[in-house]
Amino acid sequence: RKAEEMIAAGEVRVNGSVAKIGDKVDPKKDKVTVKGKPVESHVQEVYIMLHKPRGFITTMSDEMDRKCVAELVQEIPERVYPVGRLDRDSEGLLLMTNDGAFANAMMHPSKHVPKTYRVTVRPSITEDQLTQMAVGIEIEGRKTAPADVRVLSQEPGRVVLEMVLYEGRNREIRKMCEALGLEVARLKRIAIGPVRLGML
């Protein structure tokens, strides 16, 4: 309340310009002054490795009242946000942070940070299908980037694959499998770059 009064009185400046109520401020980049005196920022950077269960959407709020990952981190006092996405039916490693530079470095396509998944498909997979996944598949008019794919285990009716992707298009693994006539029974992200799910 007091802060709003000071802003309304024109006593608060952001990077030299008079602040308005509702202005967004990045404490790491913006210089905030009150009555000409700099305000020191003490933002604690927080990094969370979360094992997202199936059934949760990767968002901090949902107007349709579906379960979202915000519920899993509500005990954390800092406001954190997901780094990238995992769809509702997928599970596994999700990073959350309040460090925008870190989030951008991890997710920006130019960085090519590898993301590793364990994927259970049905009914079986051929060498030709594995090769197509490895070299890239045409999906919605665009070819997927090459992926590293290997078979971890195989039994009648199901195959477990390890897939490493270097780009992160929306639902890419599911779309690749669908294009090859494979059903995804389970999809779990186990690593983002050097950060592994481990025992979570």
What do the PLM-derived regions correspond to, one by one?
Residues R1-L200:
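Basic, flexible Lys/Arg- and Gly-enriched helix-loop patches that mediate nucleic-acid binding at interfaces
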